[in-house]
Amino acid sequence: MKKSFLIILCLALLSCVTGCKDSTQTLLKKSVEMEGISTDSMLFYLQQIQSPNHLSDKQRAEYCFQLYKATLWKTQKPKDSLLKVCIPLFLHVGDTAQWLQAQLEQANSFFYKDQPDSILHSARELRDKTKYMTPTQQRYYYNIQKFTYFNQKKYPEALKLANKVLALNNPSNDTLSLFYDHRTQLEILRKMGKTD
């Protein structure tokens, strides 16, 4: 009888532990599903996760990155402390795609805070990783640098990057992006005095 009770107790505890892990993963997944739909829903699901510091490295990285994005979209202000947690964790667990995206978000945060040296340093660190980026990530990567050089009045560097962005855009049918990219290129040329 005592042995049966211990076995049942162990099974109950085991199911609770695995149930918590499953529910954490489900909440993270639901938060991801709410991206671009509802920031409040993202935050709601993330707030349901109990003890985020006790998650696995992968789950903690996902949690911090989701919380970073939700906070950014809600407040329009980046929260670097969350990126400082998730970037090394993504690298540690081998999630290159998320690591790259978090690094790009870090560069964007530097842009928001008007830290051009930090932006260009981040860009140099990612230079050999562009082959792993999606075309959208590459556009993001080059645009951040382009606007940094533009703000520093380094127009030849900005123009090179504007041309790279346009080359990435041409195969797509995204006419709004093409419009903005051409407009930026023309603005750079105007600043250089080459608008003929």
Regions found by a protein language model. Name each.
Residues 4-5, 10, 16-196:
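A "functional boundary" signal
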